[in-house]
Amino acid sequence: MAVRVSKAERQRLLREKINENPFYTDDELADMFGVSVQTIRLDRMELGIPEVRERIKNVAEENYRKVKTILGAEVVGELIDLELGKRGISIFEPTEDMVFVKTKIVKGQYIYSQAESLALSLIDAPAALIGVANIKYKYPVKVGDRLVAKAEVIRQRGNKYFVWVKIKVKEKEVFRGKFILVALEEDFLKKRSDTVEVGN
């Protein structure tokens, strides 16, 4: 949207864009409208629209209530979309304490944790475990990158869920994982751990 418009029209369009996609950053909106980031911030303040972090947090809080297998607070990143047994999306922004000091590259354990917790969130059962994980780190991640993870249940066979997770930074895929998760019933928590089969 390179054409300049009046302030009133820009604010109308801004509200429309944010309603369509609440995850646009001020930088992205400034580029869309051909104005400064400060102008977008002022427009948002006048319209009473919170910043992107607050918008993401609001959407995530609604989705955390749907999760059955783990606590919402255990999901790594913000859970912005969830359809139990089908698909989900989370957003995660690594911080400085999550990197290797020498290279400033985000440690793989945090990226894996985002994928694992999103996969677990999809399962419509009281508890679940990862039985098998086939993962691939495809590109290094740095602080400031916004990781968008999309997970989908590809098929279900009995109590086993086959889940694919792809994590991207912008349009570049940085991680891919195929998981087999085993759904566990409530009585699992009462059994000894050596009586439950997870793999195969």
Swiss-Prot record:
Membership in a protein family: Belongs to the FapR family.
Gene name for this UniProt entry: fapR
Organism name: Caldanaerobacter subterraneus subsp. tengcongensis (strain DSM 15242 / JCM 11007 / NBRC 100824 / MB4)
UniProt GO molecular function: DNA binding; DNA-binding transcription factor activity
Transmembrane region(s): none
Key words of the record: DNA-binding, Fatty acid biosynthesis, Fatty acid metabolism, Lipid biosynthesis, Lipid metabolism, Repressor, Transcription, Transcription regulation
Protein's GO biological process: fatty acid biosynthetic process; negative regulation of DNA-templated transcription; negative regulation of fatty acid biosynthetic process
Protein name (Swiss-Prot/TrEMBL): Transcription factor FapR
SUPFAM superfamilies cross-referenced by the UniProt entry: Thioesterase/thiol ester dehydrase-isomerase, Winged helix' DNA-binding domain
Physiological role: Transcriptional factor involved in regulation of membrane lipid biosynthesis by repressing genes involved in fatty acid and phospholipid metabolism.
Gene3D superfamilies referenced in this protein's UniProt entry, alphabetically: Hotdog Thioesterase (3.10.129.10), Winged helix-like DNA-binding domain superfamily/Winged helix DNA-binding domain (1.10.10.10)
